[in-house]
Curated annotation (Swiss-Prot):
One of its GO terms (molecular function) is ATP binding. Its main location: cytoplasm. It comes from the Bacteria. Pathway: Amino-acid biosynthesis; L-arginine biosynthesis; L-arginine from L-ornithine and carbamoyl phosphate: step 2/3. InterPro entries: Arginosuc_syn_C (IPR048268), Arginosuc_syn_N (IPR048267), Arginosuc_synth (IPR001518), Arginosuc_synth_CS (IPR018223), Arginosuc_synth_type_1_subfam (IPR023434), AS_cat/multimer_dom_body (IPR024074), Rossmann-like_a/b/a_fold (IPR014729). GO terms for biological process: argininosuccinate metabolic process; L-arginine biosynthetic process; urea cycle. L-citrulline binds at Y87, S92, N123, R127, S176, S185, E262, Y274. Belongs to the argininosuccinate synthase family. Type 1 subfamily. GO terms for cellular component: cytoplasm. Its EC number is 6.3.4.5. This is Argininosuccinate synthase.
């Protein structure tokens, strides 16, 4: 089958470098490589050069850091979305954005297909493809890992040699990693056995080993406006700068290390270690402010929304009507989430050290045991009688006197 142009999600790794000549051989097509910068801090000049050497006709380097932070990370933060109680969705949030950029370039280049290097066992194939289907339903999607005969890293290296492509790739001796401005994940090797404790000295790349820290605690203040962090220690910052600042602060104190066995969308469990220093601080601070500013009913209902929101993000359904509708609800709740939270960081732990807000629902005169004008304690009796009436009736009808 001949195609004119194929847009490829390119990372510069072995898999996507092999895909370029493979696409040209099997589809007799021009391959346009697209690298999306979501804060992974790669050598993009070297990646661009590698793409051309393996046969790409054109290479796009798309800087999407600001969009990633402001339009994907912060909405998820406001929702309080955490997958299965531990995973802060770093990879999950990035994939729909990358797919969106692929679609934009495919339209610009009038491409016939979009290709990606995700394997047939992981979540990313789903995240890429459902996003592409949502944004460009008519385009063909090519997933080489599901159709080619290359079964191993050695097969891939031999394929490049056969094609006369001489690019050195290091022997795979490290963990499989995925990084962006929000997090860095580690999978494979000894982590595949959930009984093995991670060797933090070997695994961690951005966060200091909390078991070996002897540093003094550090206090940090974060200010929010409508649920969005805008200041760190009194200094106004844009989203990218703010997250980088908190990543540095948090990593110095071993904050944000999560060892997770998660349920993949495709039916299996996987184990990974995640470093999310700045994100962990933001989630903690944001929640503390919500405790102060949200009423009981809204806070409790929002907790239920957060679970479903996290599932949608994890499953790659960022552009689904439900995710967008839930975000509209979240945005309404965040109108009153304004104020400052003070935290203390020490040896991998976060401690609350104060919070204040112009929208605080905490009123000292109501909470105190002293007499006040707003709350008449005698009113409680009638409330309890009515609140407990269903249980009283049930007991009268169904419980025996000697129970």
């Amino acid at each position: 089958m001949k195609l004119n142009k194929v847009v490829l999600a390119y990372s510069g790794g072995l898999d996507t470098s092999v895909i370029i000549p493979w696409l040209k051989e099997n589809f007799d097509c021009e391959v346009i490589a697209v690298v999306v910068d979501v804060g992974q801090e790669d050598d993009f000049d070297a990646i661009k050069e590698k793409a051309y050497k393996t046969g790409a006709s054109k290479v796009y380097i798309e800087d999407a850091k600001e969009e990633f932070v402001n339009e994907y990370i912060f909405p998820t933060l406001k929702a309080g979305a955490i997958y299965e109680g531990k995973y802060l969705l770093g990879t999950s949030m990035a994939r729909p954005l990358i797919a969106k950029k692929l679609v934009n370039i495919a339209k610009k280049e009038n491409a016939d297909a979009i290709a990606h290097g995700a394997t047939g066992k992981g979540n990313d194939q789903v995240r890429f493809e459902v996003t592409i289907k949502a944004l460009m339903p008519q385009i063909k999607i090519i997933a080489p890992w599901r159709i080619w005969n290359l079964k191993s890293r050695e097969d891939e290296l031999n394929y490049l040699t056969q094609k006369g492509i001489d690019i050195p790739f290091k022997k795979e001796e490290s963990y499989s990693m995925d990084g962006n401005i929000w997090h860095l994940s580690h999978e494979g090797l000894d982590l595949e056995d959930p009984w093995n404790m991670p060797d933090f000295d070997k695994v961690l790349k951005i966060t200091k080993n909390p078991l070996k820290l002897a540093d003094l605690p550090e206090t940090v203040e974060i200010e929010f406006e409508k649920g969005i962090p805008v200041k760190v220690n009194g200094q106004q910052m844009g989203g990218v700068e703010l997250l980088k600042t908190l990543n540095k602060i948090g990593s110095n104190h071993g904050i944000g290390i999560a060892d997770i066995v998660e349920n993949r969308l495709v039916g299996m469990k996987s184990r990974g270690v995640y470093e999310t220093p700045g994100g962990t601080i933001l989630y903690y601070a944001h929640r503390e402010l919500e405790y102060l500013c949200l009423d009981r009913a809204t806070l409790h209902f929002k907790d239920m929304v957060a679970i479903r929101f996290a599932e949608l993000v994890y499953d790659g359904l960022w552009f689904s009507p439900l995710r967008e509708a839930l975000s509209a609800f979240v945005d309404k709740t965040q109108e009153v989430v304004n104020g400052t939270v003070r935290l203390v960081l020490y040896r991998g732990n976060i401690y609350s050290a104060g919070s204040k807000s112009p929208n605080s629902l905490y009123i000292k005169d109501l909470a105190t045991f002293e007499e006040d004008q707003m709350y008449n304690q005698k009113d409680a009796e009638g409330f309890i009688n009515l609140f407990g009436l269903p249980l009283k009736v049930f007991g009268m009808v169904n419980r025996k006197e000697d129970e």
